[in-house]
Amino acid sequence: MLRIIIFIILNFYNPALTSMKEDIISKMQITNNLSFNFTHTIDEKSENGMCILEYPKKIYCEYDGANKKIIVSNGRSLVIKTNNGNNYYIYPLDRTPLEYILDKEYLISKIKMLEPRSIDNKYLNFQIFENNNEINIFFDKKSLNLVGWQTEDIYQNLSVTFISSIRINQKIDQKKFKLPQNN
């Protein structure tokens, strides 16, 4: 019986992961915004670009490529705008997984309750289930930076976002989060 208890303690309680989790929470608490490059993949189709994320719930992303898509959230609504024809689509933010990903306090509260999973000895993953959304959040084990997330989009497609060239607490022009107007 003692062997079983020792086995459970050694295999399921990892103080190093617990310490990293606490360090991730501390780093998130002092982070007001992130600027980063990204690769966003849905059903094997990838797009690249750059984003500015400001807590709580604001994001501005410019996609590379022919249509120069822009995604903006002002904290309440999410707008996807394409430059070909100046069409845009508006969604209530609370109907998307970004409602949770862009909410630092929500993420911190969930991370406090979850045990991280180590992936390839490079990343820590926290798996969150909320309102029929499965959200996987990934942090780099060395830098403890947020490096991506995985969700399902509104059409039930697997959506994976990897982020790189991360800059923390940069000066941000608040006009970036103004929702685009139809021309």
What are these regions (language model features)?
Residues I4-F12:
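Sec-dependent N-terminal signal peptides
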Residues I6, H40, K57, Y63-N67, ...:
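A mature extracytoplasmic/lumenal domain signature
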Residues A16-T18:
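Boundary at the C-terminal end of the N-terminal hydrophobic targeting segment
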Residues S26-S46:
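A short, Trp-centered hydrophobic/proline-enriched beta-strand micro-motif
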Residues I30, L53-K58, S73-S77, D120-N121, ...:
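Short, solvent-exposed coil/turn segments at beta-strand boundaries
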Residues C51-Y100, S159:
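An acidic-aromatic
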Residues N84-Y123:
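Flexible, surface-exposed loop/linker segments and immediately adjacent secondary-structure boundaries
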Residues S109-N183:
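Gly/Pro-enriched, hydrophobic low-complexity segments
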